[in-house]
Amino acid sequence: KTDYEANEGRSLDLVTTLGEDVRRYPVRTELFSRDDDLDARVLEHIDAFFAGLPAAGPDHEAATRGPWWFFLSEKVVAITQGRSYFVWDIKVGRPARVLSRYVTRTPAGIGLGSPFTMQLAIQEAGLPRVLYASAGGAIGKVIGRKGLFYELVGNQINAIDGPTEYSAYPSNVSAKLAPKDPDAVAARLSAAIRERVPEPWRSTFGGTVIMDANDIGRNVLGSDVPGDWTRFEEMFA
């Protein structure tokens, strides 16, 4: 598959609820590791995309004449920051084992329903805050208010991912935290992209969006684009 073709079962084009016609180009990469230089890897693919654009056909050149943004998976950022861990390297304590039993699992992923991911949450937010949020979450279930745990715990704990059997290696044996300082990462990447991309695309580049996405929703974790980010979450559908 080239970078100018849709993924299987997907379409390049989308019309948002605001009536915007959007084209999404899924750029395929190799696996990332904590030893990778994120900026260098990203710029390599940006260079290749625009270098191949003229040969891709007039339809693609026409579609890229307007404003555009670069979307990046938060997993890639977290992995290159060293915030992804093999499960055998995570020292799980008793609180994590106990608390993880009371987490409702969803089809979107394991969430904090694993001792490994719960341990990362405790390390990131602190045990007192996790206990406080757990108590609030239990009350939220009684009164019918979903998501109260994540509101109370903060620290982007909702972006923690755990190992799943259907994931490709190493995600099937890893758990990861949310990326650190995603707004700053987005701003840094945008500055580097603006230095590399030729005109006219340099002038129409709007910025970088770091996205957390799964089967039930999308959430922008960081961006250097001002304003409401919900439109970007819809574009990523």
Describe the residue ranges of each PLM region.
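N-terminal and secondary-structure boundary signal
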Residues: 1-237
